[in-house]
Amino acid sequence: MSIDGGAVQAVVSPRAWTDGHEAVAMPAAVCLGLLRQAARIHRAGLKSYGLLIAEPGAAGYPFTATGVVFFDPRKNRRNDPGYRAAFHAQGDYFRQFDDAGFVADPGELLAACRAIEDSGQEIVAPFHTHRRQPANFSLIDYRLHNPAFAWHLIISLADPRRPVLQPFAVAKDPDDFGISDRDAGQGSELAYPGPEVRPLALVAHGSRRALRRLTTTLHPLDPADPRRPATPQPMPG
């Protein structure tokens, strides 16, 4: 944790931050709100996904986020017949779990984009949760990432007691987007191996109290030994 001009900040992602490397900056309160809402949706057995937004003049833009827009997970179109077939073509994992993957409802997406534009803010990145997988940027994440955005935030809730926030820089050709029911994929949930994807540090900033709440949420203490972080017990998958 460091203090910069009176503002307290800390790296809260697995990826460390070193001078000369890109990082994403977010207020600790925004990170905490994001985690809490994602956890509520996860407990309901659903997947979270949405948009991260910021004012165009914000420091570090577009590698920053000052607000979050959640889409209604009950409107996930992933299991509509056409989309379902395309996801099934990505491998066994996507045939086994019908909550693996998401497709935003077009009407909801349009309404959100209009509201964001009217507010004077801009979309800087998408985000979504991994309900069973670690905080990697998977093969299917790469294929479905909108190349208009330079980064993407993954929230792993594989162990809900120890959530993980990990942003990734993503470089894609504008025409490289989408999946098809003609694919014959396998292992699409595994990490994308190419140089087009790079993990970024996530630097949270704010009051000491907000930082403490966030770091405690991400790294809870073991009740048997308050000095030692709890050991995660990942779910299968």
Predicted regions and their residues:
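Conserved beta-strand-loop surface patch within small alpha/beta domains used
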Residues: 1-123, 131-237
